[in-house]
């Protein structure tokens, strides 16, 4: 989707009209269809500030962020902590912005490219836990893609970072990317419902676990989910998860919790199989054996904890 040229540019320093907090702009972090995000300093603390062309769009994001932070639980942190909402004047025009916790992390696809595809199931399970909270609050993320998800550097946890596409259940999705859009794949409409997010997540899983060459081959017209199924069938990392992925393609999950349970069961089964193989002394080969397997399981232990506690 094209960028909105009407998005105002933040001045090097500004103060909120109502709350009177002063911000020093350090650099622009990113720009999307309905807003731009800047890294700022406020009283010596780094924050991320988002400003958009339309105040109503910004306020809808604020509403969603406040909603998922109700009863905020450290076990499942869905989104950055909202810190401030205010107005400022830019070139004589009143503009709404919000400041949030700055998350130091790596984009999801870049993290997988650096660490390997063995991490994909663990990260997807984490993401499902976060989507479950969002859906329980009556929202759909909408524009789910690797660019809108980061893995934090401090603890390798998945976080959603761009709420520009969040939409109330039952409405038309406000923002989407065709590559992950259910309608573009001729698999449904753009009605905001949990199944819409789960379809996008399944497509994203296939992309993350595939080579660039294989993924490029799927981007033909017309898009059909049968192409994605072919990739899964021929991919050793994806094949064990074929049932939940295909169910997500066909809208057969009532919610993220159900898909998360299926993914967890598969990971647990593979973990048990690896442990039995190692105990029998039958060798140490296989994609889930070795240092990365251990690291993945340590990360999964944290994922399982809050997954079971929810």
Please identify what each model-predicted range represents.
Residues 159, 164-232, 238-242:
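C-lobe/activation-segment region of protein kinase-like
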Residues 22, 26, 33-64:
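ATP-binding glycine-rich loop module of kinase domains
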